[in-house]
Amino acid sequence: CYETPDELERKRKRQLARGMPPVYDRAALELTDDDIATFEAEGRTPHYRFKLSGNPIIWDDMVRGEQRIETASLSDPVIRRADGTWLYTLPSVVDDIDAEITHVIRGEDHVTNSGAQIEIIEALGGKVPVFAHFSLMLTADGGALSKRLGSLSLRDMRDSGVEPMSLNSLIARLGTADPVEPVQDMATLIKGFDMKRLGRAPARFDAEDVTRLNARILHDMPYEAAAPRLAEMGAPEGAAFWDGVKGNLTLFADVADILRLIKGPVSPVIEAGDADYLAAALDALPQGALTEQSWSEWTQDLKESTGRKGRALFMPLRQALTGKAHGPEMQHLLPLIGYDKAVARLQGKEG
């Protein structure tokens, strides 16, 4: 075919003006040798199309059911540009045949493409794969999920600390009526996945759902799965640390913040009215190696000796020991902070 882009556009506009579908008219099939010589003398180079049969293409789609594409209403797809480069249509089919692809799963915006590609597959003697075209995802507010939304790219999600299984758990259930639950491994997720449960209505993708799932994945993550990364971050060895802090994590990187509470430096927060109470707490602090029982024993003694309870009993201790009002349970943190650092912080010293 020797038409220029401008010539093809003019043809398209004329067809639309006449109420006709903008389908390529196959004028190139009528070119004579003299016509071709004239075009090439003008410096034109040909582009190539795949000639469709004009017959309907029918297949059973795993999501959409029976699909019928009338190839007579389609333009013969361009497979090679005038500059010699190939379009996606033919190379993708060749790759699929060579790789013996059995299933092609993609968005519903490719349904028409599939009709043409099935004819190309058959023309090349390949086996037609099973097709599944799912509805396109929308943003949480119903807008188009564009590639231009960089914060939703897989690379950005990975770089921000999203666990792979958090995203996998969500994607595997989007578009179904099934509840989205955190799943720790692909084998379990695959076992419960059924393409037939995908609906035709567009699914909405909310990044906040990923955040919530990420937290739940971490909360349920066994120590063995977390151990290599904990070692890289310099966390204390053993499951006790992980079991004590994972319930406060949204991202794995949050472990670094908790390690800072343990290792310091921490600037103790001591309210003016709590100085005497913290002095009493220092006197009552169990000496020597602290254990997970030390916190409950210590606070019980303080409750009996000072009459404080609830927030007034616990918050001054947390703020003095960690500099924060919130965080992992103190029964887990106290033995990790250790006796010497606890003494210094109760005295208001940074450390």
Residue ranges and their predicted role:
Residues 51-68, 99, 103-115, 168-174, ...:
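Charged, low-complexity, helix/coiled-coil-prone segments
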Residues 50, 210, 317:
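Conserved S/T- and glycine-rich ATP-binding loop of Class I adenylate-forming
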Residues 124-268, 322-351:
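Catalytic adenosine-cofactor/nucleotide-binding cores of aminoacyl-tRNA synthetases and other
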Residues 4-133, 138-145, 153, 178:
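Active-site cores that bind ATP or allylic diphosphates and position pyrophosphate for catalysis
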Residues 107, 157, 307:
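Short, charged/polar micro-motifs that form catalytic or ligand-binding hotspots
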Residues 1-9, 13-47, 231-239, 252, ...:
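Basic, alpha-helical terminal appendages of large translation-related enzymes
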